[in-house]
């Protein structure tokens, strides 16, 4: 869900690849994300009632003082998304500047407020961040010329002509794009897909009447489904590792989650108003 619920890094990457507004992308992700959350809550509730799951986390009674302390501890980190989104939506700062504010704010909390980040840990975190950033920048440095070559060679127009020679059905072409993105999402990293296929698929989607923002959110929804689907199943493997659950035990129930998220993704593809509603009324 992180890829469509702001603030989302992959939305920023898509915006830089397509020329879309980062603020519009953030706004467009709220409604599809909310629909997905409601659908998954409904799915979990259905299976909990059907299977009679009565297991629950042990309840603890907190005093008013303890509740106030816990709320205070959680309040400062929870303010970070407000600073980021508020800065972007209000126009005070760009997405890049907002990310710098978030990093500085996190550093202050970790070092001076919670005092959990030592000098050695800071060096380790900084080194990992440099490696991650370097990988992303390397991908962008290769993908940007790739997109330029695609445009110079008129590849999107050739693809558009090819799809018209096969079918003129908007439904079939959108289904093809959705299935292609889902397939790519099963074995490729999301950012790589966004950077590589946006210059090719976005012009085709625009010939079908899809806006840049609508296509972007729809693409991220399809890639989210792919990240749950074998063989890679990045999100599923991560969840299994965190919860100490075997993959083959988790997958049967995950199939229902995949079907639910797929239905939400198809709904987002088919109904532009889901993504365009908030950006339109808040401009």
Per-region residue spans from a language model:
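Alpha-helical transmembrane segments of multi-pass membrane transport proteins
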Residues: 1-283
